[in-house]
């Protein structure tokens, strides 16, 4: 484990020096081929993901190489469970995709060094085996990329490989095709603040509902993520620093016939120990990124 973390850290440190070297070579040749490299990291008070709280304080480094809409990205989460450093839970995601004219499509391979802490034993080979790997397809449309004044986005994510299965009432296994759909809009505020609003749902039973029914009998709400994020960026040459705060409300499982009472329990739930499906979560963070094009 220590070797893995050390190699990852050294790799990121080594790559972070590359953009400036590449810029010098570019200046000498006078040519620009449109290749972009971005390297950086987020320091977060907790790992929040699509309505779930997946851990405590963490460092989340990333490296992205892009060229004419094609991109290859590596992202990692190096954190601690429940605000302690007794059990590290590293994750490494590799994404390859295409982004142009507001359209996005990519495939992500997610790997959990500590096993499969987020997907659990979901029935890989009828639960006789488990895997630390999952794969996810994503398609999205970001109108703000082509019409800056309308920063509306919609994204669809579906798990296509991994421990993503459930057992029905007849003890038969079925692939869940866990799906998360998110709609977002960004608001520019005074003082160069950016407020991002997101609403995410799961349309059927999935990892996001702990493989329980959603929208059943028109009672159970399948809204996984109502998210507000306030951010301020400071741009410098070849880099930017961002500071932000975020709150997230997970409405999954709320009985629509008793919404007032259920939402009234949100604060009480927030005071309890963190868990994956806690209703209300928050975090703060800082981002530092370097970028260069040559």
Language-model features: locations:
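Outer-membrane beta-barrel transmembrane domain signature
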Residues: 69, 145-151, 155-278, 285-294
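Residues that define the transmembrane beta-barrel architecture of outer-membrane proteins
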Residues: 33-35, 55-59, 88-92, 99-101, ...
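Cleavable N-terminal export/targeting peptides
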Residues: 1-36, 266, 270-275, 292-294
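A short, structured loop/turn motif at beta-sheet edges
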Residues: 97-99, 140, 233-237
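Surface-exposed loop and membrane-interface regions of Gram-negative outer-membrane beta-barrel proteins
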Residues: 72-99, 105-131
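Short glycine/proline- and aromatic-enriched beta-strand/turn motifs that initiate or cap beta-hairpins
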Residues: 23-82, 294
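Transmembrane beta-barrel strands of outer-membrane/channel proteins
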Residues: 39-45, 65, 74-78, 94, ...
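Short, solvent-exposed loop/turn segments at secondary-structure boundaries
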Residues: 50-54, 83-87, 167-171
